[in-house]
């Protein structure tokens, strides 16, 4: 994979000479993953568990380790990237934080199960000391090796879950330019067939809500495994991203899906946790925070939203546009001020102490 991606840099046609020079100066590649949630389900491991975070951390390390060896091998064969400076280059294996530290920051004290310990014990050993020695001898071909992309489209083509995201819903309605259609998670359907529960009436009932968290007729094991993006607490979303981020050179595309009733304070806490855990970026999406969105959880919610939008449009047509806009902005501003004030002075003080002054930035070396 590293050789293929490195060759793409030379084979590609660049629209601007300036762009080509910039890319070839660092020769960054971005190998990532998808299908993470489906893999966990196949292993019988819930997404929102310490077991899943342990697997994420050590699988990410294994991927980075092999890519580092491959890129150093390419440097030995073809030379390191032109901008390589051994004094300034800081690889992930020198900056990655221990998993136990991440869990401690997030307030998680559980240990992995024997099952996961057994899985991890079968992973070949990594030797970062040897990698460092080889790096000193030959340099490295690519300034960046890994990047986890959203994989929204290619995961649909591959029939698997996207990126490192949990499944969005066991059934949902997707809206695209050519129309809308209902999707049911492929692996979930397979599990229903095993239990002889794949009756149209059962699937239709589940599709109404998109989640099986509160369906007593579905076995508890499945309810625990098929936890959807909105069933999972935000802290587990952030922990997954942080676990992968330690061994990913560039950014990690990950959305923290929050329920419609999430407050400004809830969002603030997610951003702070992501920063403390060393995530390079974070995305939060509160359900139904936009008048239109690509995916709605469950068919029932989707149709209800469409009806609400239709009624809202009719109401707006009956009012003066300027008056409608003024009211909306005033209400939104008042709501935001109220939420921020409820965070209290303690939260603001915590942020100020963590960030320090502009001349004393604690998040970078400058």
Where are these regions (language model features)?
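Internal maturation/activation junctions in enzymes
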Residues: 1-20, 24, 46-151, 270
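Catalytic alpha/beta core of large soluble enzyme barrels
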Residues: 2-11, 80, 121-125, 134-141, ...
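Glycine- and acidic
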Residues: 14-24, 41, 45-57, 170-174, ...
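Contiguous, well-ordered alpha-helical segments that form the cores/surfaces of helical PPI scaffolds
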Residues: 27-42, 58, 97, 153-156
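Amphipathic alpha-helical segments within well-ordered protein domains
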Residues: 37-41, 72, 189-193
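Residues immediately within or flanking Cys/His clusters that coordinate Zn2+
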Residues: 68, 358-361
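Intrinsic disorder/low-complexity segments
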Residues: 312-330, 334-337
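Long, low-complexity intrinsically disordered regions
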Residues: 329-355
């Amino acid at each position: 994979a590293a050789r293929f991606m490195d060759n793409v840099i030379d084979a590609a046609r660049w629209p601007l000479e300036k762009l080509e020079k910039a890319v070839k100066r660092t020769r960054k590649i971005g190998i990532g993953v998808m299908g993470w949630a489906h893999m966990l389900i196949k292993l019988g491991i819930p997404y929102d568990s310490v077991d899943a975070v342990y697997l994420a951390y050590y699988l990410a390390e294994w991927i980075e380790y092999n890519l580092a060896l491959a890129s150093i091998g390419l440097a030995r064969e073809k030379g390191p990237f032109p901008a390589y400076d051994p004094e300034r280059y800081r690889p992930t294996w020198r900056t990655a934080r221990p998993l136990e530290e991440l869990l401690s920051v997030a307030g998680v004290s559980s240990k992995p199960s024997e099952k996961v310990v057994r899985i991890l014990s079968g992973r070949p050993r990594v030797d970062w000391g040897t990698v460092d020695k080889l790096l000193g001898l030959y340099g490295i071909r690519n300034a960046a090796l890994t990047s986890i992309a959203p994989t929204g489209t290619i995961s649909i083509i591959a029939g698997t879950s996207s990126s490192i995201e949990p499944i969005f819903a066991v059934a949902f309605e997707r809206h695209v330019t050519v129309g809308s259609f209902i999707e049911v998670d492929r692996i979930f359907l397979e599990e229903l067939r095993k239990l002889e529960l794949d009756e149209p009436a059962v699937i239709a009932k589940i599709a109404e809500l998109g989640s099986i968290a509160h369906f007593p007729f579905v076995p508890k094991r499945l309810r625990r495994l098929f936890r959807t993006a909105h069933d999972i607490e935000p802290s587990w979303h952030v922990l997954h991203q942080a676990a992968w981020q330690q061994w990913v050179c560039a950014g990690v595309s990950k959305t923290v899906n929050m329920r419609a009733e999430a407050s400004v304070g809830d969002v603030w806490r997610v951003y702070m946790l992501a920063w403390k855990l060393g995530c390079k970026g974070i995305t939060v999406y509160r359900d139904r925070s936009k008048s239109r969105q690509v995916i709605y959880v469950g068919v029932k919610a989707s149709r209800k939203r469409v009806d609400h939008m239709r009624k809202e449009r009719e109401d707006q047509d009956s009012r003066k546009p300027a008056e409608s806009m003024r009211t909306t902005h005033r209400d939104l501003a008042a709501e935001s001020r109220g939420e921020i004030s409820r965070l209290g002075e303690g939260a603001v003080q915590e942020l100020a102490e963590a960030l320090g002054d502009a001349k004393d930035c604690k998040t970078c070396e400058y």
